[in-house]
């Protein structure tokens, strides 16, 4: 077994060796050991791939929409990814610092990436003909990466499954759900017996009406009978406590340390490959990983390989940048737990033993103020280089770092305590935003759902967002501060990069006064300006490519007097 060469320090290497060994034995002996070993891995590669890559549209969902059903279902006859190299994929994952790989064995379109004996709609009947899953499973075993599969419960292609494309909106003429359920059991058993033991079987598509709680619970028990230490996600069934862990999608999950969870997110915008898709920056990728782990979760980061079988080179480069960062700072990620400080848009924390790693992602002020700890701080150091000054009182912990020592992506402060950090109850940080928790309103809310209400942009939680309906091109988002407040800085974080023109305004005697105009917002937008005093502030979106959605809208007061940090 080989291990990732990025973790060069003895401490980190020891952690990684223990984690990988736990999974490669060949799998942990018990279910609880399997869950703990998986939580320690922290970072995995998600792969959505199939014949649909020939069209560059979304897997499953574009069947019957952008691509006619008849054409979509014939794509496999032209699928010949001659440049596919399992070693290259797995090496990329390993050098990115990833510890497990999840492949779409079957998505909602029904196509199988292994030569299943229960259908003819599989990789063996393409011009390519090779068993992609076999090659990937073998490469993962060689490199110490845990091999896992994604398997869709719904199947819009299979005649026995009641619903069809587009998107499960049509009904098939002669469905037979009990027979389809047996097909599903046969295929998942086939995968475990031929490619296992697996780390995870990652289900999806459980939301549709044909799938019931009874089906889900039976499948879960059936698979645990085949492989007791198999980890299964919550989408196997219905209900808040289904499966072994939760799976927030395309968002950073809320801080949660009482049940395992994993954010699944795309490196670009589409799950399957799309030409010239918008890709996340190095900063956004690394900070996403840090925020997820700081919330006590894992990150399953998705790529969609091209039709020739390669992962797009620019995506490989981005993943390797993450690996380079983890080579330096992996000790703050692998084998840690989230907290004790709850994650915000500007800060995350992880801990192991008597050590807390404070990840400062954005300097909102000259210092960072944290809630007091019930344990003493023995020492403090700056892992990213330079000096740090920490002042602890009964009311707060204040951290100061000279500006030249602040890392543009993540300034990491290591705090050594006089006792274990694990027994410290999670601590919420005071918000730096004057808008946090204030009354909010908006011109449009996605499906009138409270889950996407305007308040989500002002909750200081990077995992929730205000969203608008599909097709909305103009919208506004307003906050009432309760009383006039002085602000000198606005910070915005947008999902999906849809805004093309906007203005920031404040209310003055019944009129809206514009104090800033801009075009794109993107993942991270900051505007500083001469202080203004107002009670009502709004973001007025004048032009967007589709329904705008905002993670965070923060209003900051003028900076306080600087906290002097001596070398």
Feature annotation, model-predicted:
Residues 1-13:
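Bacterial N-terminal signal peptides that target proteins for export
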Residues 12-22:
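Bacterial N-terminal signal peptides
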Residues 27-446, 491-494, 500, 506, ...:
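Mature catalytic domains of secreted/periplasmic carbohydrate-active enzymes
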Residues 456-462:
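Acidic, glycine-anchored loop motifs typical of Ca2+
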Residues 469-483:
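Short beta-strands within extracellular/lumenal beta-sheet-rich domains
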Residues 512-514:
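Tryptophan-centered short beta-strand motifs
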Residues 554-556:
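Short beta-strand edge segments in extracellular beta-sheet folds
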């Amino acid at each position: 077994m080989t291990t990732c060469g990025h973790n060069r320090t003895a401490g980190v290497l020891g952690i990684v060796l223990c984690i990988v060994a736990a999974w490669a034995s060949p799998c942990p002996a018990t279910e609880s050991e399997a869950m703990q070993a998986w939580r320690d891995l922290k970072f995995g590669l998600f792969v959505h791939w199939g014949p649909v890559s020939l069209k560059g549209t979304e897997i499953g969902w574009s069947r019957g929409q952008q691509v006619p059903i008849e054409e979509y279902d014939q794509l496999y006859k032209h699928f010949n990814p001659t440049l596919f190299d399992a070693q290259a994929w797995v090496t990329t994952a390993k050098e990115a610092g990833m510890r497990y790989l999840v492949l779409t064995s079957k998505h909602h379109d029904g196509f199988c990436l292994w030569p299943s004996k229960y259908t003819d709609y599989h990789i063996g009947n393409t011009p390519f003909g090779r068993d992609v899953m076999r090659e990937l499973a073998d490469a993962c075993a060689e490199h110490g990466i845990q091999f896992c599969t994604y398997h869709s419960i719904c199947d819009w292609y299979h005649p026995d499954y009641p619903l069809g494309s587009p998107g499960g909106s049509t009904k098939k003429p002669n469905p037979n759900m009990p027979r389809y359920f047996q097909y599903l059991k046969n295929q998942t058993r086939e995968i475990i017996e031929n490619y296992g033991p697996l780390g995870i079987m990652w289900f999806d598509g459980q939301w549709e009406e044909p799938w019931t709680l009874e089906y889900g619970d039976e499948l879960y028990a059936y698979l645990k009978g085949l492989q007791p230490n198999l980890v299964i996600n919550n989408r196997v069934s219905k209900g808040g406590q289904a499966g072994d862990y939760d799976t927030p999608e395309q968002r950073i999950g809320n801080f949660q340390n009482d049940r395992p969870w994993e954010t699944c997110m795309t490196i670009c915008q589409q799950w399957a490959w799309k030409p010239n898709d918008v890709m996340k920056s190095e900063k956004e990728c690394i900070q996403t990983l840090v925020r997820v782990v700081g919330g006590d979760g894992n990150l399953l980061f998705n790529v969609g390989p091209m039709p020739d079988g390669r992962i797009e080179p620019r995506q490989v480069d981005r993943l390797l940048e993450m690996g380079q960062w983890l080579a330096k700072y992996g000790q703050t990620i692998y084998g840690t737990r989230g907290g004790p400080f709850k994650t915000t848009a500007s800060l995350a924390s992880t801990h192991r033993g008597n050590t807390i790693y404070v990840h400062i992602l954005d300097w909102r002020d000259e210092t960072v103020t944290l809630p007091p700890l019930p344990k003493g701080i023995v020492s403090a150091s700056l892992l990213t280089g330079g000096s740090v000054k920490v002042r602890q009182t009964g009311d707060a912990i204040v951290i100061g770092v000279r500006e030249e020592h602040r890392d543009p992506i993540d300034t990491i402060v290591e705090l050594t305590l006089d006792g274990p950090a694990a027994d410290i109850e999670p601590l919420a940080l005071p918000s730096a935003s004057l808008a946090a928790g204030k009354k909010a309103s908006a011109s449009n809310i996605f499906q009138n759902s409270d889950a996407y209400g305007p308040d989500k942009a002002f909750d200081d939680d990077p995992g929730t967002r205000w969203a608008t309906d599909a097709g909305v091109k103009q919208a506004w988002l307003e906050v009432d501060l309760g009383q006039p407040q002085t602000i000198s800085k606005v910070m915005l974080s947008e999902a999906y990069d849809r805004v093309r023109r906007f203005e920031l305004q404040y209310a003055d005697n019944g009129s809206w006064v514009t104090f800033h105009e801009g075009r794109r917002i993107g993942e991270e937008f900051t505007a500083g300006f001469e202080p203004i005093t107002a009670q009502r502030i709004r973001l007025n979106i004048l032009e967007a490519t589709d329904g705008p959605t905002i993670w965070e809208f923060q209003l900051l007061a003028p900076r306080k007097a600087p906290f002097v940090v001596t070398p």
